[in-house]
Amino acid sequence: NGGQHMRIGLDLTSGFLVFSRMAAILKRYLEYNRFIAIEAYDPSRHYDLLITNNPIHKKEQTPVYYLKNDLDMEDLAKIRQILFA
């Protein structure tokens, strides 16, 4: 991504433990690139990507990746592709 900072919002309908685990997996998978920040979704902030399992989500200018189930390797690969395409 050419040294450009990216912010990913994580918005899950599940509880804190699931959120913590998914955030940790994403961090391990993506944050070796120090330009990527992963945080709990805040509607007032701008994100380069929103990852959610909440089907009613729509914030027009933000790309959204919908999780169907738990976060798996296929999801991680697709998320990485979106970020670095």
Model-assigned labels for residue ranges:
Residues 1-85:
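C-terminal structured domains
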